[in-house]
Amino acid sequence: MSESVHTNTSLWSKGMKAVIVAQFLSAFGDNALLFATLALLKAQFYPEWSQPILQMVFVGAYILFAPFVGQVADSFAKGRVMMFANGLKLLGAASICFGINPFLGYTLVGVGAAAYSPAKYGILGELTTGSKLVKANGLMEASTIAAILLGSVAGGVLADWHVLVALAACALAYGGAVVANIYIPKLAAARPGQSWNLINMTRSFLNACTSLWRNGETRFSLVGTSLFWGAGVTLRFLLVLWVPVALGITDNSTPTYLNAMVAIGIVVGAGAAAKLVTLETVSRCMPAGILIGVVVLIFSLQHELLPAYALLMLIGVMGGFFVVPLNALLQERGKKSVGAGNAIAVQNLGENSAMLLMLGIYSLAVMVGIPVVPIGIGFGALFALAITALWIWQRRH
C-alpha cells in the first residue's frame, strides 16, 4: 500500500505547535532524568564506569525494538503513538522516584523513547513537505536542543538541591508531554493493515535496512547521523568525568552547564542549516562535521572554565549545521522508499548501535584506568578522521 500523505504546509499549524511543545517537554524530561539519575548513582556510590552503562541500557531498548517501532508509527496515528510512548516514559521516571532500581526504570524510559522517535520525526512529513521539511526539522531540532539546554541544567541544579525533587520534575515533564500529545490532530495511519507477525516484521525491517543501505544518499545520511549522535552521547559522559579532573569542580551542575553550551550552539547551527543548506546541497555540512572532532581535541586540553564554554558552544554550532540536513535527507528519501516511520527506525538502529559501541569503548577505557584527557584527545581525533573518510567516500560516489 502506498504511503498516505496528509500535509498542512504551514510551519505553524495547530498540529505543528502541538508536536513542538510535546517534543520540548519529552526531551526536557529525558535530559533532566539523565543527570538526576547520574546524581542518584553518585549518591548511592555506584562505580564511575557504571555511568555510561545507564545510557547503554537506554539505547539497548532502541536496538531491541528497532524492527517493530517503525511499523507501529506507520500503522497508527502518529500523535497517539507519541502519547503512548510518553506514558511509558512517565511510568519509568515514576518508578525511579519510588525506589525501583534506576537501571530498570531507565530501561523503561528507553522503551518509550524507542517508540516515540519514529513517530515524532515521521509526523513532520505529514504536517509539511518539500522545501519546508528542512525548516520543520530545524524547528524540531531547535525545540529538542532548547529542552536539552534547560532539562540538563534543571536536572543537575535540582539534583544538587535534592535528588528526589529532580526525579519528580522529570515525571511532571513527561506528564505535560502526554497532555500536549492530545492536541496533535489524529491523522490517518500512513500504512495501515500491515502484518503483525514478529518474524515478518523483522524480515520487513531488515528489507528496509537493505533498501536504505543500497541507496547512496540514505546510506550517507545513516552513517553521518550515527557517527554524530554516538559521539554526542559519549561527549556528555566524558564531561561528567572531565570536569573534576580538568577544572577541579565536583558538583552535579557544572557538567550540565557545559552540556548546555553545546545545546545553545546546536540551536544556532540548526538555524543556519535551515537557511543555508537544501536537500540538493547537503554536502555543505561535511566540513562542520570534521571541525567537531578537531574542536573536541582542543577542548580536552583546556583547564579554564571560560574557554571550555566557548569551545563547547562551537562544537554545538558545528553539530547543528552538520546533522539537520542529514536528518532531512533521510526523511525525504526514506518516506518515498520504505515509509517515514521505517526510515527513522532504521536510523535509530544505526545511531543507537553507534552509541552502544562508543559508550562501551568509553566505559572500558575508564574501567582500565585510562585518564579522561587522553580519552578526549583520541575521541576527537578519531571522529574527525571518520567524518573525513565519509566525505571522501560521498564525493567519490
Swiss-Prot record:
Location in or out of the cell: Cell inner membrane
UniProt keywords, alphabetically: Cell inner membrane, Cell membrane, Lipid transport, Membrane, Transmembrane, Transmembrane helix, Transport
Residue ranges crossing the lipid bilayer per the database entry: 18-38, 53-73, 91-111, 145-165, 167-187, 227-247, 257-277, 281-301, 305-325, 344-364, 367-387
Bilayer disposition of the protein: Multi-pass membrane protein
Classification via NCBIfam families: PRK11195.1
Lineage: superkingdom: Bacteria
Family assignment from sequence similarity: Belongs to the major facilitator superfamily. LplT (TC 2.A.1.42) family.
Annotated GO MF terms: lysophospholipid:sodium symporter activity
Organism name: Shigella boydii serotype 4 (strain Sb227)
Gene Ontology CC annotations of this record: plasma membrane
InterPro entries the record matches: LysoPLipid__transptr_LplT, MFS, MFS_trans_sf
UniProt keyword Cell membrane, yes or no: yes
SUPFAM superfamilies registered for this protein in UniProt: MFS general substrate transporter
Protein name as it appears in the record: Lysophospholipid transporter LplT
Pfam families (alphabetical): MFS_1
